[in-house]
A protein has these predicted regions:
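Alpha-helical transmembrane segments of multipass membrane proteins
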Residues: 39, 59-67, 204-208
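A feature for the membrane-embedded catalytic helix bundles of lipid/isoprenoid biosynthetic enzymes
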Residues: 2-37, 113-248
Length: 248
């Protein structure tokens, strides 16, 4: 005789949050994600559905702002703040729901990565095109194609290379409790810098800078910071992997 599966609680969902996530993602977005995962379980939604909803919410929010240039920038910024953080909360919720319901799968993980990559390209791309003539005026005098490219590439490259490294070297823990590297000043600075490019800060920065009319100023500084992190990450990752291979 089969027994009914007990309904999930918030505690059940929170138990499966991403423990290796950056601090703000873990304590803000995964809190939102746990609530959304709980709601999804009550509605009978699948993790894949949450992944698609996350993609649609983020890209759709950017498209709405781009489609209504007459919208006051403060209103557009507030709309982006809600849409982008709801999208990220759903992105956190899909994995939480999958782990809580024991429905994780390679296909689900692949769908999540594809949606994340496409969203990372489409959201800044759409906003970048919409920003000309609406945001910081100095950007209108520069080569627009470069600015749109710059608005997405450094952070996207950093994220993608991080995923590649984690997939190829799963034994080298990046942020978790099993990190046995010496916690030097450089390690602490690198960890702090990594938290500064977290999705919570990025999405909040996009929304607030748009509301203030300084979107391109934020993008120029933030992506420049990500570019610097990318160089440091490539160098330190190579040295880290080379050192681990010598120990074998």
């Amino acid at each position: 005789m089969s027994h009914p599966v007990p309904a999930l609680t918030y505690a059940d969902c929170w138990k499966y949050h991403g423990r290796q996530a950056f601090w703000l993602t873990r304590h803000v977005s995964y809190r939102i994600g746990a609530v959304l995962a709980l709601l999804a379980s009550r509605l009978g939604l699948t993790p894949a559905t949450l992944t698609l909803l996350s993609f649609i919410t983020g890209v759709g929010g950017a498209f709405v702002v781009a489609s209504f240039p007459q919208m006051p920038e403060a209103v557009a910024g507030l709309f982006l703040l809600v849409a982008l953080h709801l999208s990220y909360g759903l992105d956190c919720a899909d994995g939480v729901l999958a782990r809580a319901t024991r429905t994780t799968s390679p296909s689900g993980a692949l769908l999540d990565k594809i949606a994340d990559l496409l969203g990372s390209m489409l959201i800044p791309g759409i906003l970048g095109i919409a920003a000309f003539g609406r945001q910081t005026s100095w950007a209108d005098d520069l080569w627009h194609a470069f600015l749109v490219w710059w608005s997405m590439t450094p952070r996207l490259a950093l994220t993608t290379i991080t995923w590649i490294k984690e997939g190829m070297t799963p034994g080298i823990d990046r942020k978790g409790a099993d990190d046995t590297r010496e916690h030097t000043l450089f390690w602490k600075l690198k960890k702090f810098a990594g938290n500064l490019q977290d999705d919570v800060i990025y999405r909040t920065g996009v929304a607030v800078s748009w509301a203030c009319g300084h979107y391109w100023d934020f993008i120029l500084v933030f992506q420049g910071f990500c570019c610097l992190l990318l160089v440091v990450y490539l160098i330190t990752s190579y040295l880290e992997i080379a050192a681990s291979e010598k120990q074998k």
